[in-house]
Amino acid sequence: MFKRVIFSIVILFTVASVNAQFRKIPAEVTDSFKARYATASGVSWKDKLTSFQADFKIDNKEMKSTFSTKGDWIKTETKCSLEKVPLEVKDGFKKSKYASLPVQDVLKIEGKDQLTQYKVTVKKNDFNKRYLVFSSEGQMISDNTML
C-alpha cells in the first residue's frame, strides 16, 4: 500500500513538471503581442522551446499567434468555419476527393510571408483525420494524415 502511495505521488509530480513552463516569457514577446493584438482577451502563453504561442480571443474568435524568442511575429491561426472562407477555398475543398467527409475544424493561417492559407481538418473515421491546406486561391497545398 505504501509503495502505491509513493508511486502515485511520483507520477503526480512528473505530470505536473511536464506541464510547467520552462522559462519566463520575454518582454520583447509580450510587447510585440500587445502591439499587434491590443484588444485580445483571455491570453494564455505556451513555451514551445523555439518559440512562444499565445492563445487568445478577439471579438469572440479563437486565435493562436506564434512569436520567435526575440519577439518577431511568425504566424496567427484563427478558428473559422467553411462558410466563412473565401469562395475559391470553398470551391477547392468541394472539388477535392475529401468533400464527402465531415469537416471537423477550419483554421485561417496568416504568416509573416504575407500569405494566407486555410487548414481544413476532415474526419474519415474515429482513427483517421486528414489535414488539408489550401491557398487563398483554392489550390490544395498539402494533404496530411493523422492516425
Question: Which residues fall in each region the model found?
Answer:
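Interaction-mediating elements
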Residues: 21-147
